[in-house]
Amino acid sequence: MRQQYDTSAPPAAFSVADAFMLRTALDALGGVRGLDTLDVACGHGSTARLLASGGARRTVGVDSCPERIRRARAHETGETGEAGAVEYHVADAAGMPQLGPFDLATAVYLFNQAHDRVALHAMFRAVRANLRPGARLLAIVPNPGAFPHVDWSPYGIRIVERTPGGDAPLLRARLETDPPVAFECREWAHADFAEAAVDAGFATVAWQPTRTPPACEIRDEPYWARYRSAPVSSLMNCVA
């Protein structure tokens, strides 16, 4: 569900809303200046760069795809060839090595990639093992139960098929880009995420209300009001 298409294209509405929701949560915590930060499933590095630009003492990005890490590093070095502010590692989230400890971790559409309950719990345990006591995990996760009742295509994503089975239903979907990008993920309930977090050792789990950016010429307030009535994602806030 991460945006794996051409990053020069304008971001989809759901991605814009996610970024705003995450920035708002970070601001409410007082920012990241002086913190050691970790971004899991970092993709091309946009969230990791956000953390680094906010004054984090150390920022580490982790992703299982070598090509996404290559592109993230290329964005960091740019034309100068100098090392960037983010340290990147190729690693599977469920088997992530000890890279910390960190004061804050972020994860955007990571946990819905878990193919079964064992993998889901392993992901949360790997993140928790890299956090200091009292550290925080901010995770953006998709909301379950939308298909076939809600059409998310105006916001940049379409659920094509839902197949029950396994520990969670399989969703086949696509990003409404040009060309479209197909992907699959599991439709975990929020209770499943919370259970895995508590099992991993997080002391508290909370869910923050969906927040959207201010209206603009492209997306007015009625547009965002419709989005908030059935949002793509929620923000999970866990304290170690």
List the model feature ranges, each with a label.
Residues T106:
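A conserved beta-strand element that flanks and buttresses the S-adenosyl-L-methionine
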Residues Y109-Q113:
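Short catalytic micro-motifs in class I SAM-dependent methyltransferases
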Residues M1-V32, S46, L50:
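Conserved class I S-adenosyl-L-methionine
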Residues A196, A200-A240:
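C-terminal lobe and adjacent flexible extensions of AdoMet/dcAdoMet transferase-like proteins
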